[in-house]
Amino acid sequence: MKNKRRGIQGVFGQAIVIILLIIIILLVIMPIYVTVMYSLKTNSEYIKGVWALPKNPQWHYYTAAFLNIKSYMLNSLLVCVLTTAGVVLFSSMTAYVFSRHDFFGKNFLFALVMALMMVPSVLTMTPQFLIVLKLGIYDTRWALILPGIAGGQVGAIFLFRTFFSQQPSSLFESATLDGASDLTMYFRITLPLAIPVLIIQALGTFGLMYNDFLWPTLVVKDESIKTVMQSLKNIAEKVNGTTPGVSYAMYLVSGVPLILVSLCGLKFFVNGDFASGMKL
C-alpha cells in the first residue's frame, strides 16, 4: 500500500510540474505570438484583434522595419561590442591579480569591490552623468561605452575571480619555473581555460548594453549615434498611426542581433569547443 501511495504521489507531483511548465512556456510564448501576429496583419485585420490569423501576411513590413532602424542597430552593435570587450578584458585582468597574487590590502580591496555590488545602479547615475560632462564626452558614443565598461566591472570581477581561483595552481607553478611572465600565463593559461565563463559574462554584458534605454536617453541626443532602444519608441509612434504592423515588426527585428549572439555563444558549449583550452 505504501509503495502504491508513493507511486500515486509521484505521478501527481510530476503532473503538477508539467502543468506549471506548460503555463510558464505559454506566458513566455504569448507576447512573442501576439507581436508576430500583429506584425503580419493589414490595418483592417489589426483592428479585429490578435487571434485571427492574417489572410495575406505583410512580409514587406519587415523590410520597412529594418530600413527604419538599421543605422540605430549598427550604433548599438558598435557600442555593445566595444563595451563587452572592455568589460571582459579589464575585469579578467583584475580577477587574475586577485586570484594569483598576494599583496597588502588584497582582501580589503576585494571586499570593497563586493560592497559596490550592493549599491543600486540608479544611485550612480547622477555621479556618472556629472563625470561624463566633466570629461567632455556628452552626446558621443564614449558616453555609452566608458560608463558601460566601468559599471560592468564589479560583477565580472567577482565571477572571474571565483572561476580563476579554481584553476589548477600546478599549471602556473610549472609555467613560472619555465620563466613565463604574468602576461603570458594570463593569455596562454588563464583565458583559454576560462572560455565558458568569458562567454557567459560577454553574453550578459552584451544583452544589458543592447537593451539599455534609460542611460542612452540621458547622455545621447544626436540622432546619428542613438541606439536602437532609443529609436524604437520614437519611430513606433510615427508609424503606429498609419501602419501599426511595421512598429511590431521593428520590435522583432531589433531582437535579431541578441538571438544571433546568443546562438554563437551557445555553439561553444554545444560543440565542446571550450575544452580546447586544456591543450596548453
Where in the sequence are the language-model features?
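A structural signal for multi-pass alpha-helical bundles of membrane permease subunits
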Residues: 4-9, 13-280
